[in-house]
């Protein structure tokens, strides 16, 4: 049971004392208490309960950095939050069990995860994924969730009567898919406090014999047996952000020979792009610091630092693929054969054959992952040509753009250097072949700029090959001819019907063109209450309109930038929320909260 895994140790008949200034002991509660030592992502939580009751009196967070001392054979001292706590156990055996737990926790300080991760980053990371609202955001990404479901269902042969490991299980949704596909048993490993919610879902769905929730990091837990297949959703921005892929690969120590991994491989695509508006947007932000009389203060000394800071931010949004100036370069990672150390420094050599003349403002990134099953191959894509996901696409600007001509070759390299903040420094070094022109930049993938607003993605300037005005009026004329209507300045004559002036090439976004995001049946983070009457839920293919109230009062923009960003469905119009269409374009006029 999960309680036994979450609750590492429970001891009765304990007494807690506070050590005063004169080293005198003061019984904190005046009676015996029970102590429960429970799993926590940062170590463990020591919880104090009234004896014979579930009433919790106190909770002390204990990490590998917590100072603690042995005192005799039945007592131990903890120093937590500046307070010295003297714990007297009922027996020598109980005290030894408690000390053994502390030793085991200290031994985990050198786990692979802890060695590569700052404490502050890990704390923020696990806190983020411990919120139901964040799990909901990912689950409501229709493309993400449904692709995983399709990949598992269509390869049920790989799951039938198999032992499955779900790495970073979160809510456990992938574990449920595996059981539905016939898995004999699923070990759902989750390091955040979401593990307790996953266990609640397992119990309420009567699957406690099929799905075993294990609270802990895959680098630190032990499994009772080897597994046949590993499932996970470890992708971040630009595929590698969050460094969860390393945890996914680490899980292979439990994988049987010839076992499978879902996903099986990941492709990171890189392409040069042109976008003068985006470049000037970032450039002009830094020009704030060009003021010489800002409330009597000269700010110019900080302008260069501000410019560097803005251009160190990767841009998270979506774009028209026609801004790409060359075919994308693909960097592939085979998860079945790759080692986690291979992801510590990723170098991608690039050679772009320019297809059109213009200014290259930087490099665009997106990724695809493949589920290579025995029966079918399924792909999940975040390409700008596909339905929008909560990963969007990422663009990295050059502070000094390069003017390129059709037929020229732009070469160089992109290096992703892993850091202890569970992210990467992105180093770009580009050179225009046959010239002395070069441009470099280093960006901080941990600090992206989430630019997507929900507005329609405009076509690149100069995309029209015919007159849009003539095409618009020509289609109106054709419509009028079909309806046998005589028009005078758009007004019907002789009562012969009307021409719809809004149906062709307007700047208004059709209601049906919304991101392909499944809303589920509950309210969503960041969503506004619809003022529009809704109809009962219908099948997915019916494109239902669902009104939901926000479930979180936190700043959604800040919440969503650790993993993927806000699901596109959570962008709202002032009067309505339309979701689950077959297109990847957002609602016109939507606002971001």
Curated annotation (Swiss-Prot):
Alphabetical UniProt keywords: Chromatin regulator, Cytoplasm, Methylation, Methyltransferase, Nucleus, S-adenosyl-L-methionine, Transcription, Transcription regulation, Transferase
GO terms classed as biological process: chromatin remodeling; peptidyl-arginine methylation, to asymmetrical-dimethyl arginine; regulation of DNA-templated transcription
Lineage: superkingdom: Eukaryota
PROSITE patterns: SAM_MT_PRMT
Modifications made to the protein after synthesis: The dimethylated protein is the major form.
Record GO terms (molecular function): histone H3R17 methyltransferase activity; histone H3R2 methyltransferase activity; histone H3R26 methyltransferase activity; protein-arginine omega-N asymmetric methyltransferase activity; protein-arginine omega-N monomethyltransferase activity
Catalytic activity: L-arginyl-[protein] + 2 S-adenosyl-L-methionine = N(omega),N(omega)-dimethyl-L-arginyl-[protein] + 2 S-adenosyl-L-homocysteine + 2 H(+)
EC number of this enzyme: 2.1.1.319
Residues annotated for S-adenosyl-L-methionine binding in this entry: 135, 144, 168, 190, 219, 247
Segments forming domain SAM-dependent MTase PRMT-type: 122-429
Residue ranges of the region described as Disordered: 521-540
Top-rank EC class of the record's enzyme: transferase
Biased composition (Low complexity): 523-535
Main location group: cytoplasm
Subcellular location: Cytoplasm; Nucleus
Modified residues (Asymmetric dimethylarginine): 482
Gene Ontology CC: cytoplasm; nucleus
SUPFAM superfamilies: S-adenosyl-L-methionine-dependent methyltransferases (SSF53335)
Subunit description: Homodimer.
Function: Methylates (mono- and asymmetric dimethylation) the guanidino nitrogens of arginyl residues in proteins. May methylate histone H3 at 'Arg-17' and activate transcription via chromatin remodeling.
Similarity field: Belongs to the class I-like SAM-binding methyltransferase superfamily. Protein arginine N-methyltransferase family.
Name the UniProt record assigns to this protein: Histone-arginine methyltransferase CARMER
Species annotation: Aedes aegypti
């Amino acid at each position: 049971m999960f309680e036994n895994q979450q609750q590492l140790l429970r001891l009765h008949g304990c007494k807690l004392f506070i050590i005063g200034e004169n080293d005198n002991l003061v019984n904190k509660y005046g009676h015996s208490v029970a102590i429960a030592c429970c799993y926590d992502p940062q170590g463990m939580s020591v919880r104090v309960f009234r004896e014979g009751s579930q009433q919790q009196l106190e909770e002390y967070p204990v990490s590998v950095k917590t100072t603690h001392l042995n005192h005799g054979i039945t007592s131990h001292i903890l120093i937590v939050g500046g307070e010295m706590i003297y714990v007297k156990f009922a027996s020598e055996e109980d005290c030894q069990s408690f000390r053994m737990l502390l030793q085991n926790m200290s031994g985990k300080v050198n786990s692979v995860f802890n060695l590569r991760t700052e404490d502050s980053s890990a704390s923020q990371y696990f806190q983020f994924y411990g919120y139901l609202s964040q799990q909901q955001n990912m689950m409501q990404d229709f493309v993400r969730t449904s692709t995983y479901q399709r990949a598992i269902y269509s390869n049920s042969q790989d799951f039938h009567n198999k032992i499955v490991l779900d790495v970073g299980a979160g809510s456990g949704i992938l574990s449920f898919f595996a059981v539905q596909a016939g898995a004999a048993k699923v070990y759902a490993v989750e390091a955040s406090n979401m593990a307790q919610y996953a266990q609640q879902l397992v119990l309420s769905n009567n699957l406690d014999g099929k799905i075993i929730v294990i609270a802990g990091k895959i680098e630190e837990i032990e499994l009772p047996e080897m597994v046949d297949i590993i499932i996970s959703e470890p992708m971040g921005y630009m595929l590698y952000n969050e460094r969860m892929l390393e945890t996914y690969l680490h899980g292979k120590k439990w994988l049987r020979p010839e076992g499978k991994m879902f996903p099986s491989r990941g492709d990171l695509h890189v392409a040069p792009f042109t976008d003068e508006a985006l470049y000037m947007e970032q450039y002009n932000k830094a020009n704030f610091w060009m003021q010489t009389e800002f409330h009597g203060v000269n700010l110019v000394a900080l302008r260069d630092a501000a410019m560097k800071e803005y251009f160190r931010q990767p841009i998270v949004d979506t774009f028209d693929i026609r801004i790409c100036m060359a075919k994308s370069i693909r960097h592939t990672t085979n998860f079945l054969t790759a080692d986690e150390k291979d992801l510590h420094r990723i170098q991608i050599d690039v050679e772009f054959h320019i297809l059109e003349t213009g200014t290259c403002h930087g490099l665009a990134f997106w990724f695809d992952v493949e589920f290579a099953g025995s029966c079918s191959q399924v792909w999940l894509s975040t390409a700008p040509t596909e339905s929008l996901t909560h990963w969007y696409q990422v663009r990295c600007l050059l502070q000094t753009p390069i003017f390129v001509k059709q037929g020229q070759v732009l070469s160089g390299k992109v290096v992703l250097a892993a850091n202890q903040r569970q992210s990467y420094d992105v180093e770009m070094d580009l050179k225009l072949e046959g010239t002395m022109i070069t441009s470099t930049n280093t960006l901080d993938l941990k600090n992206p700029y989430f630019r997507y607003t929900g507005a329609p993605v405009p076509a690149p300037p100069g995309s029209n090959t015919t007159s849009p005005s003539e095409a618009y009026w020509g289609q109106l004329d054709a419509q009028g001819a079909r309806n046998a209507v005589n028009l005078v300045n758009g007004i019907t004559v002789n009562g012969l019907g009307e021409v719809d002036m809004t149906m062709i090439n307007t700047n208004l976004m059709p209601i049906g063109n919304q991101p392909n995001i499944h809303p589920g049946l509950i309210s969503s983070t960041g969503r506004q209450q619809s003022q529009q009457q809704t109809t009962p839920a219908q099948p997915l293919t019916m494109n239902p309109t669902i009104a939901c109230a926000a479930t979180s009062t936190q700043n959604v923009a800040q919440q969503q930038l650790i993993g993927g960003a806000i699901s596109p469905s959570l962008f709202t119009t002032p009067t309505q929320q339309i979701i689950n269409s077959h297109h990847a374009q957002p609602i016109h006029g939507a606002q971001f909260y």
